């Protein structure tokens, strides 16, 4: 099968398309998936460049990729038919740092705890965009912040991968959402449900907002320090 692999840490020039990658072996608690689409995130190039090698050293050759969508071809021992079965359309994470075989391949193995059934209304491409950013946004809003109905939250970088998902999830939780974006992205985040949109290039958000319950900062730097003023 084909896969995108690296044989050493480095920038994009170390990535190779291997036409003869062995099909990944299936073990207990995992599923084998025929990949239909895969998502690309900043963490993928960070892994490729060795940014996580102290915590998660790769064994080369290593198949890249985390987010995916596809169809289950085989289930391992310990996977109940009530959870997943052959033919199920799923999406989730198959990165090697989370026990998978790498999503940038025609076939991938993923932990059953790292996947979910794909909603019928989502295409494979749409579903493959969601896992990493969706989990990150959901954990911050529900576990770290415990955001609830009628609370006010400022989300920095609302047009980005995590920010755009965070806006939608925060609105589904009943929160009032303000966000910072560039002027050209204002229509996009308004469509997502943002109640207040601030152009970060021309408007000082800390002078416009006050008494907010939470700030979700996906930007960092000086934005982080200035954000304390709105709480």
Q: How does the language model describe each region?
A:
Residues 128-201:
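Mid-domain Rossmann-like dinucleotide-binding core that forms the NAD(H)/NADP(H) cofactor-binding site
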Residues 2, 89, 175-177:
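Residues at the starts of beta-strands that form the adenosine-phosphate
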Residues 79, 93-157:
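NAD(P)H dinucleotide-binding glycine-rich loop of Rossmann-like/cofactor-binding domains
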Residues 79-83, 177-188, 221-224:
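Short glycine/proline-centered loop/turn elements that form peptide/ligand docking sites
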Residues 178, 192-231:
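Glycine-rich cofactor phosphate-binding loops and adjacent beta1-alpha1 units
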Residues 83-85, 147, 231:
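Short, well-ordered loop/turn sites that connect or cap secondary structure elements
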Residues 87, 105, 150, 194, ...:
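Local beta-strand N-terminus motif with an aromatic residue
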Residues 22-39, 52-96:
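Glycine-rich beta-strand-centered segment in the early N-terminal region that forms part
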